[in-house]
């Protein structure tokens, strides 16, 4: 009984490690998604400037602080 418990416990540990690796991969995906959304944001901002409309989504402190606020890993 003890051996089976130990093997199941090690299996749970391996499962947790695999989940942790998956989530670490997901954080990379989140970074990529944030970069894509930032690109869309910049395109929308440029389009609104070209059209002469003030953009409501514009960051009040500039793009540098926008990156600092939204790119927390």
From Swiss-Prot:
Name used for this protein in its record: Uncharacterized protein 236L
């Amino acid at each position: 009984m003890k051996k089976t418990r130990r093997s199941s416990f090690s299996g749970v540990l391996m499962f947790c490690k695999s989940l942790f690796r998956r989530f670490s991969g997901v954080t990379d995906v989140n970074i990529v998604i944030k970069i894509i959304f930032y690109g869309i944001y910049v395109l929308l901002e440029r389009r609104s400037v070209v059209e002469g409309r003030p953009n409501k989504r514009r960051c009040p402190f500039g793009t540098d602080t926008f990156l600092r606020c939204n790119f927390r890993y």
